[in-house]
């Protein structure tokens, strides 16, 4: 994560803007200050944290922009405008950093869903993008949707797609399980999962599970196919067991088959003479329906100045666990007379992190989380906790 360390920070008078970077407002607690930052069409927090002999300035990991160049540029402008005695820095803004909006990266699910059409392939954890770009070139009439947790991978593959004149890809930063949950039923032709982290000693952390397999079956078209490629026999066998719970699935099992394209991980495993396993699954015959999305309905909550004082005074770092969702109050920040809450919530295997801005009403400081049922339930619980636990 790009960052730098400074001995001194000047007085921060906001709003402040320079070179398409805007610092609009600041919220803080005893240890951390958050600066609401806009670069072109994206918003995120810069984080200032007290450290030994100074301050560490970096991007907040739960609001970081989809393009690393935005964060690098914001750090550069903040350093030049507000900092003295720089101790060290690790955010050099390169001339080829991806700053301009790229059509290959979508910022949220609403934008994604509006752009999905025709035949769709999904690659989960596309990494360096070798296989994803290969599929895009081989299937020019198919939209290749790549989902990846790590932002740098999105930026790298978007650059490669532009350089190679590949136009039929879309990339999104997300947990794959969350992505599948928002897609329409029977809308995807193929799902690729190549060389996932096997988690052989911690199988509960695997993306594969019963719910994931059900979602694959729901979103795949009739005779649509799930394809796993892995060097872990344990992962291969575990995945097979999950799909065997369906009534009459069909399988293709292969070992050490050379494909037309090889990822950097596959190259490494072959040099180590590891076995490579392929598992293809289709014919799920899964009855399914599209989910009806509800609203968060935050407009029903109103606060007085006295309410906000009580929330600030009575705030506790607490976690509420229900059968199918959780809610964790992580931190609270003061923004003039208003408050900022950081919370984690949602399904246990698809957690969300977000900031809520509290003034006379309550709203999400950034984009809304997607309206899956677990998130709706968690936000409804949050509204009740604010009234009961924090005594307003």
From Swiss-Prot:
Disulfide cysteine pairs (residue numbers): none
Chain coiled-coil ranges: none
The enzyme's E.C. designation: 2.1.1.33
Pathway: tRNA modification; N(7)-methylguanine-tRNA biosynthesis
GO molecular function, one term: tRNA (guanine(46)-N7)-methyltransferase activity
Catalytic activity: guanosine(46) in tRNA + S-adenosyl-L-methionine = N(7)-methylguanosine(46) in tRNA + S-adenosyl-L-homocysteine
Domain of life, per lineage: Bacteria
Chain positions recorded as substrate binding sites: 201, 231
Record-level GO cellular component terms: tRNA methyltransferase complex
Alphabetic keyword roster: Methyltransferase, S-adenosyl-L-methionine, Transferase, tRNA processing
Alphabetized Pfam families for the sequence: Methyltransf_4 (PF02390)
Keyword Ribonucleoprotein: no
Residues that bind S-adenosyl-L-methionine: 123, 148, 175
Family: Belongs to the class I-like SAM-binding methyltransferase superfamily. TrmB family.
Stated role: Catalyzes the formation of N(7)-methylguanine at position 46 (m7G46) in tRNA.
Identification of the protein by name: tRNA (guanine-N(7)-)-methyltransferase
Organism: Campylobacter jejuni subsp. jejuni serotype O:2 (strain ATCC 700819 / NCTC 11168)
Organism placement in taxonomy: Bacteria, Pseudomonadati, Campylobacterota, Epsilonproteobacteria, Campylobacterales
């Amino acid at each position: 994560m790009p960052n730098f360390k400074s001995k001194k920070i000047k007085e921060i008078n906001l709003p402040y803007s320079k070179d398409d970077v805007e610092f609009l407002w600041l919220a803080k607690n005893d240890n951390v200050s958050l600066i609401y930052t806009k670069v072109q069409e994206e918003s995120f927090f810069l984080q200032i944290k007290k450290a030994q002999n100074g301050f560490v300035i970096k991007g907040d990991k739960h609001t970081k922009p989809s393009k690393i160049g935005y964060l690098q540029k914001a750090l550069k402008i903040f350093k030049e405008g507000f900092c003295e005695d720089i101790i060290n820095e690790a955010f050099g803004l390169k001339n080829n950093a991806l700053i301009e909006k790229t059509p290959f990266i979508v910022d949220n699910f609403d934008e994604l869903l509006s752009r999905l059409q025709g035949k769709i392939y999904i690659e989960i954890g596309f990494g360096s993008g070798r296989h994803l770009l290969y599929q895009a070139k081989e299937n020019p009439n198919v939209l290749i949707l790549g989902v990846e947790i790590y932002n740098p991978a999105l930026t790298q593959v978007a650059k490669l797609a532009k350089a190679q004149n590949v136009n039929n890809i879309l990339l999104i930063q997300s947990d794959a399980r969350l992505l599948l949950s928002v897609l329409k039923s029977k809308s995807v032709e193929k799902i690729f999962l190549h060389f996932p982290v096997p988690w052989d000693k911690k199988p509960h952390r695997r993306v594969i599970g019963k719910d994931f397999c059900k979602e694959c079956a729901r979103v795949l078209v009739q005779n649509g196919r799930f394809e796993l490629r892995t060097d872990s026999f344990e992962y291969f066998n575990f995945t097979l067991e999950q799909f065997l719970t369906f009534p009459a699935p069909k399988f293709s099992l292969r070992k050490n088959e050379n494909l037309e394209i090889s990822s950097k991980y596959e190259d490494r495993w072959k040099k180590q003479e590891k076995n490579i396993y392929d598992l293809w699954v289709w014919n799920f015959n899964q009855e399914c329906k599209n989910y009806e999305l509800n609203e968060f309905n935050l407009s029903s909550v109103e606060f007085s100045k006295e309410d906000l004082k009580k929330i600030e005074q009575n705030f506790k770092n607490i976690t509420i666990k229900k059968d199918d969702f959780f809610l964790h109050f992580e931190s609270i920040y003061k923004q003039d007379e208003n408050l900022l809450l950081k919370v984690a919530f949602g399904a246990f295997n698809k957690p969300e992190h977000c900031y809520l801005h509290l003034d006379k009403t309550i709203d999400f400081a950034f984009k809304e989380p997607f309206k899956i049922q677990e998130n709706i339930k968690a936000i409804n619980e949050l509204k009740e906790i604010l009234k009961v636990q924090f005594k307003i």
